[in-house]
Structure formats: C-alpha cells, structure tokens
C-alpha cells in the first residue's frame, strides 16, 4: 500500500537517510547508558549556583522544545533545558543541532550542569546524538474539546505532549496500589479466575462471544467474576478479591467502556453491613492516602472522609415522590403507579420489584451527590442476593452512589441452592420475554452451592469510575490508556 507523506515528514525521512548514509543510523543503537534520569538530574543539582565542569552527565529523552541553541529534553521523570555554546562545540556538532535535529527526536546529550542568567538549571552540551528519529512531527496544538477524541485515539502522542495526561495514568497506577494495600491490610487474598466463561452469569449484561476451536463451542468473555469467586469460598477460602478486566457488549458513553476494570470482593461469615463498612473504609483510605478528602466533580464538591449516607430504596422513593411502595402489594397496582408517574417499563419489567427499581432510577439517582448507600433492592433485580427475610420481596443488597453514578454494588450472597435455582429459572423466563441481559441457568454453580456456601458478603467496585473520581475526570476515556473508539470516518 502506497503511503503519502506531508512536507515535514518527507524532510525528516531525508534527514534519516542522510544519517544512515553517514553510518549514523539511530535505529542501530541498542542501549543508552544514562548517568541518571532527568528527574535525578534536577534533584541533584537543584541548589547549583555556578557552572559545575567537574560533573560530566549523560541524559536521554525526547526533545520537546527547540529555540536557537537551546532545547528542552523530557523523560518519564521530568524536563530539563540544554544548551549548545557556539564558542565551545565543534562546527559539525552545531550543524548537527541546526540541520538534523527535530522536535520529537529521542536523543542522548552529554555535558555539564550550569545555571543560566535567568537562573534555570541547564546542561551545557558537549555532544548530542539522535538515538531514535521521529519521522512524524509533534502536533503544535493539542488541547481543547475538539482534540478529546484525537487524544484518546492517539494516546501515545497525548502522553508525549500532555503532562497532565501522563499524571492521570501514573495516578491510576498509584490508586491501584493503594487499593491492594488496603485489601491486604484486611487479610484478603488476591486471586485470578478465568476470562473465558462457558455460561453467562454473575451480572445482567450483554456479552462478547468467542469460539473455542479445540472444544468446538462458544465461550463468553466474562461479564463478572462473581460466580468463580464464590466457588472459591465454597472451596474453603475465607477472604478473596480479584481486580481484572470485564467485558460487556454494550454502549459507550462518558462512564461506560465495553472493556473495563472491576474489583470483586468476597468474605465468608460476613453480612451486608460488614461489606458496607468495608466499602466506606476503602474509599476513605484511598482519599486519605492521596490527601484528597474533597474532590470536585463538575459543579459539585464531594466529601469523601465524612460519614456516608444510608437509605432504603423504598424510603428514598417515598421521600422524593410521596409513593409508598411498602403499601403496594400487587404487580397491577405497581403498573398503575408507573403509568401515573410516567415511568415507562418493558414487558419483562412489569413486576412490582422491577417497577420499584425503575422509580428509583427515575426519581432518586440524580439526588445522590454525596456518597450514598442505597440498600434493600427488590429480588426481581437481584438474582444473586440473599433475600431480606424481614421484608419479603427485597434483598440484603446495596449500591454506592456518588455524584449520581453507581460506584459499588454489594450484597449478602444468596447461599440457598433451591432459591438460587428458582431465581435462575426466573431469569431464563425474562430472557424469553426479551431481556437480553438476563443470566443463564448455571448448574455447575448450583452444584457448588449444594456443597454449602457459608454466609458470605460480596462487593463489586468499578475501578475506572473510582479513578475518575479521585483524578476529577468526567469521562472514562480520560482514565483508560487505550479506550475503545469508533472507526475513523
């Protein structure tokens, strides 16, 4: 396929050709022996006042600025200025700087540190060599709303030119470490479970399907890690968690990506209230570790170290609408209330439990600005949750909402194999009525429960949304290194 290059790209390719013909091919270089990183250079000579000719330093990085005989070089750890003194360097070196070097080139520079008249730490360069030629120029402008898609599509360029973007992803790594530190401090073991599942389960979502050639059957990319983790509790593990990729063949928006990271947590012999405390303590631990007790999301300031609000779903609906679902006993009555309040429902959502959940989504979610635990979800929308024996029709389940978005979902796990079998059957019926997200019958999981699952509490946390919260980003694209994108038109 023939490629077309613009004028700048053609000039850079010509410079590369000249280097190669002069036996200076930068791509032949395998290793650069740096004296130190640029970050270490800036730290070591932070108090330097005069020219230190006794220190001969070799630095390496990308050229991100050029002006006359000055330049700026950048590596992962920082930026520093460099300078070629016309009176000191050879004519050939000066010509190399002026006629061969381009913005974006990766170079090694050798020289000694000094301070300019303006007081800026600078490397007085004796020798400069390109170790990787940039054949594409860096963009001149790389900011503003119009560039958001471009930045996500070409993340490598975004990372080169946008320090703020690099910081977000370094923060992401740091937050993941902090989460693991917290889980380790609570005596949890991190485990790994399969990504390919033979049966769809663990969440209500549409899957990606792939074909296993050897086994001659379809598999699903996991939509949750719940069922295999609960099997580990059956097997005798006490406290486990998994941080990993989840795949859901659904839409994309500011808080959804088809491939995302979640953490699921399971603890034997614990209940919903324990998991609620653990969730609150996790968010507070991360907030304190990052020294961010308050984060700003849009116009809202979120207070993460204050006590999280707790409210039952039915009480919340009554508070916002005046409708008291504690007094509603039939599907027909619920449907009439839905029509009266313009709450639309599909055929598979015509039960009392589904309509309660729809009322919550319609009238209550938007009111959850500060961290709020909403608990007591209907059985109809909670096929894996233990029922609330004091309130038939409801479960021991909660969701954590912050700034109107769900951040965590947890419950006392259903460990009654007979009840679980019946709920799977109900899900199969829902699928036949058009609910593409209903789970399938999983007899292997039923058999695992029949061996005995102790009373268990479980939790799922959306890691990407959590990172959005602590980095104060409004789009999931901004916290994913390589988000899924529509094809270029």
From Swiss-Prot:
Query: Could you tell me the superkingdom of the organism this chain comes from?
Result: Bacteria
Under catalytic activity, the entry for this protein gives: tRNA(Lys) + L-lysine + ATP = L-lysyl-tRNA(Lys) + AMP + diphosphate
State the UniProt keywords alphabetically.
Aminoacyl-tRNA synthetase, ATP-binding, Cytoplasm, Ligase, Magnesium, Metal-binding, Nucleotide-binding, Protein biosynthesis
Its required cofactor(s), as named, are: Mg(2+)
Which GO CC annotations does the UniProt entry carry? cytosol
CDD domains referenced in this protein's UniProt entry, alphabetically: LysRS_core, LysRS_N
One GO term in the molecular function aspect is:
lysine-tRNA ligase activity
Q: What is its EC number?
A: 6.1.1.6
| Subcellular localization(s) per the UniProt record | Cytoplasm
Where, by residue number, does Mg(2+) 2 bind? 406
Group of enzyme by EC: ligase
Cite the binding residues for Mg(2+) 1. 399, 406
Co-factor binding details: Binds 3 Mg(2+) ions per subunit.
Summary of subunit composition and partner proteins: Homodimer.
Q: Which family does it belong to?
A: Belongs to the class-II aminoacyl-tRNA synthetase family.
What protein am I looking at?
Answer: Lysine--tRNA ligase
Name the species this protein comes from.
Malacoplasma penetrans (strain HF-2) (Mycoplasma penetrans)
What is the phylogenetic placement of the source species in the record? Bacteria, Bacillati, Mycoplasmatota, Mycoplasmoidales, Mycoplasmoidaceae
């Amino acid at each position: 396929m023939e490629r077309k290059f613009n004028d700048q790209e053609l000039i850079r390719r010509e410079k590369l050709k000249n280097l190669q013909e002069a036996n200076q091919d930068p791509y032949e270089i395998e290793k650069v022996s740096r004296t130190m990183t640029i970050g270490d250079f800036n730290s070591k000579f932070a108090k330097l006042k005069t020219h230190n000719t006794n220190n001969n330093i070799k630095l390496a990085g990308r050229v991100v600025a050029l002006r006359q005989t000055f330049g700026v070089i950048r590596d992962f750890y920082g930026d520093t200025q460099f300078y070629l003194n016309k009176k000191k360097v050879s004519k050939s070196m000066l010509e190399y700087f002026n006629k061969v070097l381009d913005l974006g080139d990766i170079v090694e520079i050798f020289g000694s540190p000094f301070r300019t008249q303006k007081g800026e730490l600078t490397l007085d360069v004796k020798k400069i060599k390109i170790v990787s030629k940039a054949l594409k120029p860096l963009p001149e402008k790389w900011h503003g709303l119009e560039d958001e898609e471009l930045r996500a599509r070409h993340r490598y360029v975004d990372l080169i030119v946008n320090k703020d973007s690099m910081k977000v992803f370094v923060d992401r790594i740091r937050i993941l470490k902090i989460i693991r530190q917290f889980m380790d401090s609570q005596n949890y073991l991190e485990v790994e479970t399969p990504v390919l599942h033979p049966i769809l389960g663990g969440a209500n979502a549409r899957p990606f399907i792939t074909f296993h050639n050897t086994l001659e059957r379809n598999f699903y990319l996991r939509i949750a890690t719940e069922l295999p983790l609960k099997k580990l509790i059956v097997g005798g593990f006490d406290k486990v968690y998994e941080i990993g990729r989840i795949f859901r063949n659904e839409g994309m928006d500011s808080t959804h990506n088809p491939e995302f990271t979640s953490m699921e947590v399971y603890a034997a012999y614990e209940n919903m209230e324990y998991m609620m405390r653990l969730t609150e303590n996790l968010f507070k631990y991360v907030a304190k570790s990052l020294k961010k007790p308050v984060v700003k999301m849009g116009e809202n300031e979120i207070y993460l170290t204050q006590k999280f609000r707790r409210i039952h779903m039915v009480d919340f609906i009554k508070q916002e609408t005046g409708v008291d679902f504690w007094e509603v006993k039939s599907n027909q009555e619920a449907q009439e209330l839905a029509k009266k309040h313009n709450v639309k429902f599909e055929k598979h959502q015509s039960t009392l439990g589904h309509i309660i959940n729809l009322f919550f989504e319609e009238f209550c979610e938007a009111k959850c600005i500060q961290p709020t635990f909403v608990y007591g979800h209907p059985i109809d929308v909670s096929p894996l949750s233990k029922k609330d024996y004091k309130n038939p029709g409801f479960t021991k389940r909660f969701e954590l909402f912050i700034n109107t978005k769900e951040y965590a979902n947890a419950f006392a796990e259903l460990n009654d194999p007979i009840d679980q079998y019946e709920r799977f059957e109900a899900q199969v019926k829902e699928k036949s009525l058009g609910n593409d997200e209903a789970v399938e019958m999983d007899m292997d999981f039923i058999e695992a429960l029949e061996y005995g699952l102790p009373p268990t509490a479980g939790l799922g946390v959306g890691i990407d949304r959590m990172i959005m919260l602590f980095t104060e980003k409004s789009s999931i694209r901004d916290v994913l290194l390589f988000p899924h994108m529509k094809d270029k038109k």
